[in-house]
C-alpha cells in the first residue's frame, strides 16, 4: 500500500476530523485501541495538506505511554511513518541509538524509549464494509 503515513491520536475523540468512520469500524477501533493496530479509513476533508491527494489514512492509538503523552501534550495528533528497508527486521529499526546514527540528518529528534518490539502492528483496512487484515502483526482481533 502507498499509505505509509499514519496519524497517531491520543484517543478516538476527534477521529471524525481526520477520517470517515462507520459505526462498525468505530466499534472495532474502540475495542482494540490503544493497541498495536493501524486502521485504514477513508480520509476526511479536514486533513492536513500532506494528505490532500490521498483517499485513505492510517489511524493509530498506540499502547505506548511516551507516544501518547507526547500527542496529549501537543494537543494534536502527530504524523508518523514506518521505517522502510529491504530487510524484514533489522536492528536499527528497534534500537534508539542505531536509529539516531542512521537517521540523524533526516529527522529532528529521536526519543529514546528503549528498544522497540520486533513485531509490526496489525493493519486493518476499514475503507469498505468488509474489513480486511492487510498485515497480521502483534495485534489480535
Question: Where are the model-predicted features located?
Answer:
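Active-site-adjacent structural elements in enzyme catalytic cores
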Residues: 1-141
Amino acid at each position: 500500500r502507498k499509505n505509509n503515513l499514519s496519524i497517531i491520536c491520543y484517543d478516538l475523540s476527534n477521529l471524525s476530523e481526520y477520517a470517515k468512520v462507520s459505526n462498525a469500524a468505530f466499534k472495532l477501533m474502540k475495542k482494540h485501541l490503544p493497541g498495536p493496530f493501524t486502521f485504514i479509513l477513508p480520509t476526511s476533508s479536514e486533513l492536513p495538506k500532506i494528505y490532500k491527494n490521498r483517499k485513505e489514512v492510517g489511524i493509530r492509538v498506540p499502547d505506548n505511554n511516551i507516544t501518547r503523552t507526547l500527542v496529549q501534550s501537543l494537543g494534536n495528533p502527530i504524523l508518523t511513518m514506518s521505517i522502510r528497508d529491504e530487510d524484514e527486521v533489522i536492528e536499527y529499526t528497534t534500537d534508539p541509538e542505531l536509529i539516531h546514527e542512521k537517521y540523524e540528518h533526516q529527522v529532528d529528534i529521536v526519543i529514546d524509549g528503549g528498544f522497540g518490539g520486533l513485531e509490526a502492528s496489525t493493519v486493518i483496512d476499514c475503507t469498505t464494509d468488509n474489513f480486511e487484515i492487510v498485515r497480521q502483526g502483534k495485534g489480535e482481533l
